[in-house]
Amino acid sequence: MLFRQPTIEWQTNGICNYDCSYCIQSKKFRQGYPSEEEIEKFLEFFATLQGNWEIKMSGGEPFAFKGFMDKIVPGLALLPHKVSVLTNFSAPLTVLRRFVDLLGDKLSVVSVSLHLEYVQAADFVEKVSCFREWLAPTTSLVINNVLVPNTLANLLEVKSLVEQAGLKYFPQIMKTKHGVFSYNLEDKDLVIQLTGKNPSSKQANLAPSYRGLLCWTGVEYFVLDQKGNAWSCRTAKRFQEGYLGNVLTDTVKLKTAPSACKYDICPCTVPATRGMIEGSNKIVYED
């Protein structure tokens, strides 16, 4: 059984400085951010959590929101919890250095997303390599890459470039608003070359189904949007299920016991890698 790391996935803001063609987040949700008063409410809520949680932040793009570095990160640095971030890594290195300096060994995971519609792979890898030198030995660093159809042969070269630099390459199959993308036969073979035959949730994101497995989301894991709404998991939120209350109105109430997963897709690997899904390490993927 995996150790369960209590985790919150917090969408700190909606605004994003990229507009990727394959982004499944609707443009109407890629806007907005919390006020200074609302940020204080979030921080006060995190301070009430018992034990050591991991607060993994995403957007939009977190660094595109001025309040992220002005208020959120300094505030989290004062709390006992771990901090992680998902970023497109477009922020200047000077800003990224301050981010690392503020959090120190509280920084747990930095997931940087490589979007080839906006950057050159070699330049991106060079920047990530520089950033890596500032991290504590306990901080994990990974380069995420969406497996966009008709680009996969080129991504084999990108994967090699990343790994030659001693960095971790983390492929993600492309998702749609209704599930996962249906690759053609040629691309399916390339997907396997990029992900491996039966990757674990720490090696690739294949958005599998955990239906029927005992799941601790809503108990020791939940997602939080920029408006303060808490949901047991991403898929539950998509179906408007698993609502846990709102941070800004002091109404969040977590579940007290795990339950069997009832969904056909888990779009994010965080619940599995944080030990929330019992038996997820035994999943075998079909060709």
Which residues does each PLM region occupy?
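Canonical Radical SAM [4Fe-4S] cluster-binding loop centered on the CxxxCxxC motif
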Residues: 3-38
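Cys/His-rich zinc-coordinating "finger/knuckle" motifs
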Residues: 23, 27-31, 222, 240, ...
